[in-house]
Amino acid sequence: MVLVVLVIVAAGGFALHSGLDFFEDISGADASEERSLYRSANLEPALAALREEVGPRMRVDLKIEQRSLKANASVPERGDLLVVVTADGDVVDTSTGAGAEDAPRLRAVSADAVEKIADAVVRRADIALEDIAYFSMDTSKRPAWNVYLDGGGVWAAGLDGSDLRRSL
């Protein structure tokens, strides 16, 4: 009972923070390096599908997992959306989201920067790519990425991959 309550409280805390944890990594697929969205060749089709769904100039708050991409976006005429895209570039869900008025525009997100950050975290933390739980956009100050590790710990970097540092 206590464990269940702790899990619910922990999960709820992040969901309230970002609104992007509503959907789990929906693919259920193995997070192998060659299929990981932390690789630019795999992330770019997912970003392209997202651009097509919401437009490249829309502001987005992103969460990138090994096999899925989730975005809160504020889209004129459609309102605030939560869009989920698989690693194959398929839009699998679009529902009401939390909005992203203070987030960067989608065109500012670089698949190459995500791969650069992932490679640097793997090297500096001495982990495997599969040990990265997810990337989450931090829009509280200047746009940046927070990189959460499965075993605990958080790394932070600029949206372009600069200034990588251990955060927690």
Report each predicted region and the residues it spans.
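Acidic/histidine-rich, surface-exposed loop or edge segments in extracytoplasmic proteins
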Residues: 19-34, 88-104
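Aromatic-residue detector
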Residues: 49-53, 72, 81-86, 103-106, ...
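Extracytosolic low-complexity repeat regions of secreted or lipid-anchored proteins
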Residues: 104-158
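Extracytoplasmic low-complexity, Pro/Thr/Ser/Ala/Gly-rich segments
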Residues: 19-81
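Hydrophobic single-pass membrane-targeting/anchoring helices
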Residues: 1-26
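Extended intrinsically disordered, low-complexity coil regions enriched in Ser, Thr, Gly, Ala
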Residues: 62, 75-99, 145-168
